[in-house]
Amino acid sequence: MPHTITTTDELAAYCARAATQPYVTVDTEFLRERTYFAQLCLVQVAMPGTDDTDAVLIDPLAEGLSLEPLYELFRNVNVVKVFHAARQDLEIFFVEGGLVPTPLFDTQVAAMVCGFGDQVGYETLVRRIAKANLDKSSRFTDWSRRPLSDAQKVYALADVTYLREIYEYLSAELARTDRTHWLEEELAQLTNADAYVVDPENAWKRLKLRSNSGRVVAIAQQLAAFRETYAQEKNVPRNRVLKDDALLELAGTKPKTVADLGKSRLLLRDARKGAIAEGLVAAVARGMSVPNSEIPKVQAGRDRSNLNPALADLLRVLLKAKAENAGVATKLIASSSDLDDIASGFTDGVWASGWRSEVFGADALRLLNGEVALAAKGQKVKIVEV
């Protein structure tokens, strides 16, 4: 049965061994349904090797256990930290330990570069690369409950044991095709610590504002900042404090008193009284007092009034053909929104530089300028010089 580490000394000994290896594979189990911050419940780590002691479970809920030895390993620049779909795991370690593990390898991103499709799942990679099938019977486990059953432990550990073979295959494939630098460009976004810092003052930018009124924007900014701060301090999901539609309603109705909140059709019961209600009214007042010159500007989307639908369709055909030829997921090269931008006459974007330009961007611009055309030959689409 998988071994579970429950003491700091044992964790330090394991991490000292792992520090001599070229890489470790890492995964986490956590809960987030009822909290703002994810509750870390289990960490799975494996190093190269077949011995039972090479892959372990770490119980962060064990009394007295410090994860500092693990964080020291995460800071070791000589050991690659391998994850699959790393973003949520990285966010947890940033919040819990104040760091982003580096150097990083994300097998989901690497698989997209290697032609396995868009956002391919771990189970698919296990089946296609490791030629194994995962037992998913423990998928919906409450990982905060103890003790964990043997079946739950086996399920959790499989998330890092097969990951070793997947990493070795994908890293070799990247080296063979000279695409390692493609992956590094993508991973730079994941390892940027700023991506995991939530600034309450910028929380309003996630809202889908339906009004262009500057005053509505100012109030929405203050309401969103209050909601984010309250949710963080109380560690509750932001939508349990104030739902987006209720926030936008208040930004429009501009309640001046707690009693005015009773007129809302959308406010949750707990938001109509007490600290939340008082905070909402105060936020509205702050929004009303923001000078016009300091009201944040809503970033307007690009004007696509000149969008040529036929050209957008041609670009989609070109993208799919070029992606298939290069063995890269289309989503990694350009999004549907990018294609609409190109078809509207915009010639800047991530697709227009670096390896994306080599694979697709340069030919997209040539198509836009009438220098090439698309033709079908049998089952293949090819580019024809005009």
Curated annotation (Swiss-Prot):
HAMAP family documented for this protein: RNase_D
Localization of this protein: Cytoplasm
Protein EC: 3.1.13.5
Similarity comment text for this entry: Belongs to the RNase D family.
Matching Pfam families: DNA_pol_A_exo1 (PF01612), HRDC (PF00570)
Catalysed conversion reaction: Exonucleolytic cleavage that removes extra residues from the 3'-terminus of tRNA to produce 5'-mononucleotides
Protein name: Ribonuclease D
Name of encoding gene: rnd
Keywords: Cytoplasm, Exonuclease, Hydrolase, Nuclease, tRNA processing
Native organism: Jannaschia sp. (strain CCS1)
Domain HRDC positions: 213-294
Signal peptide: none
